[in-house]
């Protein structure tokens, strides 16, 4: 949980050069992030707080090519989308490595229901999705399961929105065997503890100078801490402070240049942290001002935290072999190609004779 560790250090240090209010706010947020890291199960819920008109205005500002505009159906689905993530570890999350996590679940939903869900329990991954709804959202309807040939196998269950599962350990072993045949796997990107500390110190120094913290009492015993900063100034100075550490970062991590960031809006953005009994329960960020578009009336993100529940394996999931699934997919495609009949070939021969 590098991000949690860095965020905690940043928020604590941000008060060091500030007022008494800065000191109090930074200390409280530091403790709140520290409590999150000590949990073994944790759930996050991310809500996109927007509306169709704002999404359409944002899309229009990007000047899409004719025909590539966001469909109304997609805007409606995205406008109230929610992403829920739960994790479970054998150790406190702040001390956990990849092998310590024993369960993970992620779900994407909206007012109409669940759109897609993914769970990782032990060596198995479980997946299901509402392809009918997703197809409408993308403007490209999914094929009907009953229209698929027998060779499609488990692909039918996938399209019907049923739970399917596959063995991730077997997939990793197969991938490793392929990498060995090609000369060995590439080293995985890592961020060592020394580099993490350098990053935290660099970011903390900028936050202390550029971010304004304030505290206020809320309802039902909650407390609100707001952090406000001009967006372009903050991110430009953040990346400027981090850039000298590039040589210590994992390969492939490229940082944006000042030139890349010069057109970013410098509007002030505020994050509102909600604490209850000292625990961080919610973060709200209003991004509408960053759009610099009067038609974007509503564009916010809300992140809610809770203790979480243990992810469980769904019952009656159909086991599939990814290779068999691909064979079924290509088999279905070949079946469609087979419909290119002998009469079609005869027509081609005729066309050649006419040349």
For the regions a protein language model found, what residue spans apply to each?
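Subset-of-secretome marker
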Residues: 18-355
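N-terminal export and membrane-targeting signals
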Residues: 1-6
């Amino acid at each position: 949980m590098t991000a949690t560790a860095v965020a905690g250090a940043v928020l604590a240090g941000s008060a060091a050069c500030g007022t008494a209010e800065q000191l109090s706010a930074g200390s409280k947020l530091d403790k709140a992030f520290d409590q999150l890291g000590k949990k073994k199960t944790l759930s996050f819920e991310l809500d996109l707080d927007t509306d169709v008109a704002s999404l359409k205005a944002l899309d229009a500002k990007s000047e899409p090519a004719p025909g590539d505009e966001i469909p109304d159906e997609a805007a409606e689905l995205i406008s109230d989308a929610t992403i829920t993530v739960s994790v479970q570890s054998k150790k406190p999350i702040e001390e956990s490595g990849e092998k310590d996590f024993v369960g993970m679940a992620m779900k994407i939903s909206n007012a109409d229901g669940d759109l897609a869900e993914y769970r990782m329990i032990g060596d198995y991954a479980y997946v299901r999705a509402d392809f009918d709804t997703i197809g409408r959202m993308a403007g490209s309807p999914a094929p009907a399961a009953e229209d698929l040939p027998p060779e499609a196998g488990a692909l039918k269950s996938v399209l019907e929105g049923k739970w399917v599962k596959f063995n991730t350990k077997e997939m990793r072993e197969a991938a490793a065997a392929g990498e060995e045949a090609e000369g060995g796997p590439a080293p995985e990107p890592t961020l060592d503890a020394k580099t993490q500390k350098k990053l935290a110190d660099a970011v903390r120094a900028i936050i202390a100078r550029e971010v304004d913290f304030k505290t206020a009492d809320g309802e039902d015993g909650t407390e609100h801490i707001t952090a406000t900063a001009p967006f372009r100034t903050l991110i430009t100075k953040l990346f400027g402070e981090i850039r000298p550490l590039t040589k210590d970062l994992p390969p492939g991590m490229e940082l944006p240049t000042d030139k890349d960031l010069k057109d970013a809006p410098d509007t002030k953005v505020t994050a509102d942290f909600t604490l209850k009994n000292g625990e961080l329960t919610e973060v709200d960020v209003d991004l509408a001002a960053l759009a610099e578009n009067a038609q974007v009336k509503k564009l916010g993100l809300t992140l809610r935290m809770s203790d979480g529940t243990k992810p469980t394996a769904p019952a009656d999931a159909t086991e599939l072999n990814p290779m068999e699934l691909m064979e079924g997919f290509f088999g279905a495609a070949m079946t469609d190609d087979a419909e290119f009949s002998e009469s079609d070939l005869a027509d081609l021969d005729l066309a050649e004779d006419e040349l």
